[in-house]
Amino acid sequence: MALLLELAHGLPWLYFSLVFLFSLMIGSFLNVVIHRLPIMLEREWQAEYRSYFNPDDEGVDEPPYNLMVPRSCCPHCNHPITALENIPLLSWLWLRGRCRGCQAPISARYPLVELLTALLSVAVAMTLAPGWGTLAALLLTWVLVALTFIDLDKMLLPDQLTLPLLWGGLLFNLLGGFVSLGDAVIGAMAGYLVLWSLYWAFKLLTGKEGMGYGDFKLLAALGAWLGWQALPIVLLLSSLVGAFMGIGLILLRNHHQSKPIPFGPYLAIAGWIALLWGDSITRWYLTNFL
């Protein structure tokens, strides 16, 4: 930590460069999490289903599948991805977005996640003073990136990410983080109850589900990290971003009105903005409108 402080004050360009490069590698790992975690959960659910409803069915012995095993490979030709082909961002550019084995296109989202993770991390490093708070904010940022893309893909916010994020926020603030422990606990409770109440009010009025329970847990986690004071701005920003994005998708005819839109990404975006600039936005609003 002392070395980071010296770099940040003496050689800020080197400090930000190291944050960028390290976060590119984190983004590469997040791609693995985004792709594999839903598959791991699906396999787990299938195994639980068999154990409850078909206890005599032993199923098929499947090879291990987790975040480390098996080795990453091309989904089209099973060409194993070598170390040189797995350099964040650069490998995709070097391969021109195609598999070295079969020349099948590689989704541009892989380098996008890596670059987005790196840029958001640099923004955190430039906005917050170097210290444990910056490291905690980086961790929060990385988990929010993973949750955003999983929800976009699968309409799912896994408990395996939201619950550790919630407890991590409480623990961080217990140790003297962004807010007091009392504010963090109230933030977690209020975050969950607000969306839970909206969910049931909407369901009673329309008979439809407006959001999932993962959204409750994500807002609770943001409340645990940022305190209850940040919840109004998180809800306001997420609603505004969600409304603009939803209207834009409908106008572009890329989205049918009856098709659900994941709310988790908008909560994640709003939570990240509140993390860095929530106090400034609140002061600006109070100064100009109240």
UniProtKB/Swiss-Prot annotation:
Coiled coil: none annotated. The chain crosses the membrane at residues 14-34, 106-126, 130-150, 161-181, 185-205, 232-252, 261-281. It is found in: Cell inner membrane. Zinc is required for the N-terminal methylation of the mature pilin, but not for signal peptide cleavage. It catalyses: Typically cleaves a -Gly-|-Phe- bond to release an N-terminal, basic peptide of 5-8 residues from type IV prepilin, and then N-methylates the new N-terminal amino group, the methyl donor being S-adenosyl-L-methionine. It is a multi-pass membrane protein. Plays an essential role in type IV pili and type II pseudopili formation by proteolytically removing the leader sequence from substrate proteins and subsequently monomethylating the alpha-amino group of the newly exposed N-terminal phenylalanine. Belongs to the peptidase A24 family. This is Prepilin leader peptidase/N-methyltransferase. It comes from Aeromonas hydrophila.
